[in-house]
Amino acid sequence: MDKIKVGLQYWIPQHGLTRLVGKLASAKAGSLTTAIIRWFIKQYNVNMDEAKHADPKHYKTFNEFFVRELKEGARPIAEGDAIITHPADACVSQFGPITNGQLIQAKGHDFSAQELLGGDAALAEEFKDGSFATLYLSPRDYHRVHMPCDGTLRQMIYVPGDLFSVNPLTAENVPNLFARNERVVCIFDTEFGPMAQVLVGATIVGSIEQVWAGTITPPRGNTVYKWDYPASGNHAVILKKGEEMGRFKLGSTVINLFAKDAIRFDESMANGQPTVMGTPYAHQQ
């Protein structure tokens, strides 16, 4: 059955299905929208007690519900300049060293930092012998993505690609998954060197948005696009630890890359471990 589930993903019209679901999720359908949201909450055991607006009737579209805001104070940010915090509510898929330019996707499957970063060899070199972590956001999770540390945006890269599911089953069976799916790469300069925060698209992920640029995808294309940002001035993008930096409609995966000897992961990190945005993730070396 697992092989069938994975195999079907090669045959379904990934982009067409994603466009359709995106349109439906953005539709204002009144009581039908409310009914779908109620079903989703029950089906995935979504904790609405922490949502700023707990009543499903508040949300005019499914997407509004999916990127729901939390109550103030629901995610306190761990203090301390040396503490790097989890960027999202998620589950640790894999983490560890970047070895020979390779990151672990799942047992028996690796992928390259250079491919993940859109084929930019010079950029990948900045993370040579560094560290990475892959975080999977499930349907029930809070789907806004935050900064794990203070950072100044240097570059944003849109990399077109497939839209396979990114759930654990697919990660274990589709080679090069995260380097073949559509993604938005954000490169930040921090006090401890460069840091990449990569938002990976997936089947029925209708859009990836950034707080400084709005919706990056759709529209979708076949060309890698790059945007460079100044370190200071009116057009600089400077974000503090814990600030929102992006969001998924619907959910997906976040991958962080850190430079060599820049960080050590927190002792709480383990594959399969649930994460809570704002809690300790790693520490500056």
UniProtKB/Swiss-Prot annotation:
Residue numbers annotated as active site: 89 (charge relay system), 146 (charge relay system), 252 (charge relay system), 252 (schiff-base intermediate with substrate)
Keyword set includes Cell membrane: yes
EC class name: lyase
Cofactor: pyruvate
EC number: 4.1.1.65
Gene Ontology cellular component terms for the protein in this record: plasma membrane
GO molecular function: phosphatidylserine decarboxylase activity
Keywords attached to this entry: Cell membrane, Decarboxylase, Lipid biosynthesis, Lipid metabolism, Lyase, Membrane, Phospholipid biosynthesis, Phospholipid metabolism, Pyruvate, Zymogen
Gene Ontology biological process terms, A to Z: phosphatidylethanolamine biosynthetic process
Modification sites for Pyruvic acid (Ser): 252
PTM description: Is synthesized initially as an inactive proenzyme. Formation of the active enzyme involves a self-maturation process in which the active site pyruvoyl group is generated from an internal serine residue via an autocatalytic post-translational modification. Two non-identical subunits are generated from the proenzyme in this reaction, and the pyruvate is formed at the N-terminus of the alpha chain, which is derived from the carboxyl end of the proenzyme.
Annotated membrane topology: Peripheral membrane protein
Cofactor comment text: Binds 1 pyruvoyl group covalently per subunit.
Keyword Cell membrane: yes
Site (Cleavage (non-hydrolytic)): 251-252
Localization: Cell membrane
Catalytic reaction list: a 1,2-diacyl-sn-glycero-3-phospho-L-serine + H(+) = a 1,2-diacyl-sn-glycero-3-phosphoethanolamine + CO2
Major localisation: membrane
Functional pathway: Phospholipid metabolism; phosphatidylethanolamine biosynthesis; phosphatidylethanolamine from CDP-diacylglycerol: step 2/2
Known role: Catalyzes the formation of phosphatidylethanolamine (PtdEtn) from phosphatidylserine (PtdSer).
Family: Belongs to the phosphatidylserine decarboxylase family. PSD-B subfamily. Prokaryotic type I sub-subfamily.
Subunit structure comment from the entry: Heterodimer of a large membrane-associated beta subunit and a small pyruvoyl-containing alpha subunit.
PANTHER family the UniProt entry points to: PHOSPHATIDYLSERINE DECARBOXYLASE, PHOSPHATIDYLSERINE DECARBOXYLASE PROENZYME, MITOCHONDRIAL
Alphabetized NCBIfam families for the sequence: PS_decarb (TIGR00163)
HAMAP family per UniProt: PS_decarb_PSD_B_type1
Name of the protein in question: Phosphatidylserine decarboxylase proenzyme
Species the sequence originates in: Vibrio vulnificus (strain YJ016)
Encoding gene, per UniProt annotation: psd
